[in-house]
């Protein structure tokens, strides 16, 4: 909708008379905040990890604090780091006023430990699963997956990163000093009112998109880094928005890992797609000592920002994700980026069957069926491969619990090099072909879910239930 003459005069008067536009119409502040780095919570033998879901206060803009949800007293949650071979006792405590269920996307555990409808945590109650970590290094994330309420619960702040490390990742010559040269970046979009308070009005179709870009809860932050390689663990925790990331001076991003672990070798890219729910690891060469910014597309012009005073906008006010500012001298010895990240090529098995799935909003649900907790949509066998062909009439991300998959083709073409590792989340704009490997078992009482990662669509029923039966014993 274009601005009427009267609306334009009103907006111009606001801008000139007050000396500045309200928060929603302002461009990003010239005074950048420092990147908030979530505290690190590590597993220790015999000691539980506590994640308390509670109300908190957080300043998204300046010093104006807004009421939010979060974990352990802050917006979003701590970064949890565990190790392959650990048995992690996790204690979720719900100190909110409504039921919540939590899950860890990317963690390979049985359906009994995945969360969801069968593991609702009532207000004032706890859930204390013991999680056997038996998988290679991966960047996972924990978040609310409350049935029919996942979108507002994640938007409110119930999310955080969950890192799995193993012997390979510990020996890898990649930056590994958390908060020094190894940073988690949780990217979201929000809509803030003139007081810096998040607004959430889900649309009748599609998913919610905001006009304000946040990283770890901050707008356009900066971080000081040492000269040399810097490692960024990227998570798109937005409800629906996909990002195309690039560096401001044209230098490459080196992609080293996707959702479920390392790529076979680093991949240099000028632009990198990050879909909702997707995780990627990149490293950046800061050895020359030049400041650089990560950006995500084109920002709104002044007319778009003025229009945002009168109607919700889906155009980002600023597309600045993060500015990296190198400090200090270049170390005498710096590691080169390894030529190989995995000792062996990814081994593919034989596909035993094919399935097709239609994701839509015109025809709600998946294959025209709305999620039903009493219905099993897919039954598979642990240790087998299947070919899944996913179609979408509206671009969206798609996630499967309890599996790892390889992207074989996208709209008939081979997958991009940065998408040729193990994944659990994929962007679907047309048709994608996946080869799905079933790692873990589930049951009708504790099924895995597959769903649209456009969270409002998942809440409206674009989800299905997967039961993976144990492999037969010989």
From Swiss-Prot:
Positions of the Plastocyanin-like domain: 229-288
Species for this entry: Yersinia pestis
Top-level taxonomy: Bacteria, Pseudomonadati, Pseudomonadota, Gammaproteobacteria, Enterobacterales
Stored Pfam families: Cu-oxidase_2, Cu-oxidase_3
GO terms (BP aspect): FtsZ-dependent cytokinesis
PTM: Predicted to be exported by the Tat system. The position of the signal peptide cleavage has not been experimentally proven.
InterPro entries, sorted: Cu-oxidase-like_N (IPR011707), Cu-oxidase_C (IPR011706), Cu-oxidase_fam (IPR045087), Cupredoxin (IPR008972), FtsP (IPR026589), TAT_signal (IPR006311)
Signal peptide feature range: 1-27
Physiological role: Cell division protein that is required for growth during stress conditions. May be involved in protecting or stabilizing the divisomal assembly under conditions of stress.
Keyword Transport included in the entry's annotation: no
Superkingdom assignment: Bacteria
Cell compartment(s), UniProt: Periplasm
Homology family: Belongs to the FtsP family.
Residues forming coiled coils: none
Name of protein: Cell division protein FtsP
A GO term, aspect molecular function: oxidoreductase activity
Cellular component per GO, a single term: cell division site
Keywords linked to the UniProt accession: Cell cycle, Cell division, Periplasm, Signal
Disulfide bridge positions per record: none
Keyword Cell division: yes
NCBIfam families for the chain: PRK10883.1 (NF008135)
């Amino acid at each position: 909708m274009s601005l009427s003459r009267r609306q334009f005069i009103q907006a111009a008067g606001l801008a000139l008379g007050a000396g500045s536009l309200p928060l929603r119409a302002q461009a990003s502040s010239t005074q950048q905040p420092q990147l908030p780095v979530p505290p690190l919570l590590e597993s220790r033998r015999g000691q539980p990890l506590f994640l308390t879901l509670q109300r908190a206060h957080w300043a998204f803009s300046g010093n104006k604090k807004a009421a939010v949800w979060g974990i352990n007293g802050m917006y979003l949650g701590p970064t949890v780091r565990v190790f392959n071979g650990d048995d992690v006792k996790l204690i979720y405590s719900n100190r909110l006023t409504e039921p919540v269920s939590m899950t860890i996307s990317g963690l390979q555990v049985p359906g009994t430990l995945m969360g969801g409808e069968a593991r609702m945590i009532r207000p004032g109650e706890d859930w204390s699963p013991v999680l056997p970590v038996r998988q290679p290094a991966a960047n996972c994330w924990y978040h609310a997956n409350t049935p029919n309420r996942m979108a507002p619960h994640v938007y409110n702040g119930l999310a955080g990163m969950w890192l799995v490390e193993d012997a390979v990742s510990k020996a890898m010559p990649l930056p590994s000093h958390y908060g020094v040269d190894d940073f988690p970046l949780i990217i979201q979009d929000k809509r803030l009112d003139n007081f810096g308070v998040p607004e959430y009005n889900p649309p009748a179709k599609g998913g919610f998109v905001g006009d304000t870009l946040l990283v770890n809860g901050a707008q356009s932050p900066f971080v000081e880094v040492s000269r040399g390689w810097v490692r960024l663990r990227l998570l798109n925790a937005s409800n629906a928005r996909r990002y195309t990331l690039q560096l401001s001076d044209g230098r490459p991003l080196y992609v080293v890992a996707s959702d479920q672990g390392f790529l076979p070798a680093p991949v240099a890219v000028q632009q990198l797609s990050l879909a909702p729910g997707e995780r990627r690891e990149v490293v950046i060469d800061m050895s020359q000592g030049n400041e650089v910014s990560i950006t995500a597309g084109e920002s709104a012009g002044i007319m778009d920002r003025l229009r945002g005073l009168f109607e919700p906008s889906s155009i980002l006010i600023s597309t600045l994700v993060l500015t990296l500012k190198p400090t200090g001298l270049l170390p005498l010895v710096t590691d080169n980026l390894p030529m190989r990240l995995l000792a062996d090529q990814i081994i593919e098995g034989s596909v035993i069957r094919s399935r097709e799935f239609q994701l839509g909003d015109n025809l709600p649900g998946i294959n025209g069926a709305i999620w039903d907790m009493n219905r099993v949509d897919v039954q598979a066998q642990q240790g087998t491969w299947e070919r899944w062909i996913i179609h979408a009439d509206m671009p969206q991300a798609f996630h499967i619990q309890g599996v790892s998959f390889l992207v074989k083709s996208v709209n008939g073409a081979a997958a991009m090099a940065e998408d040729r590792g193990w994944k659990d989340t994929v962007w679907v704009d047309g048709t994608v072909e996946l080869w799905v490997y079933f790692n873990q078992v589930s049951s009708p009482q504790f099924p895995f879910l597959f769903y649209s990662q456009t969270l409002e669509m998942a809440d409206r029923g674009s989800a299905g239930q997967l039961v993976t039966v144990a492999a037969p014993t010989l």
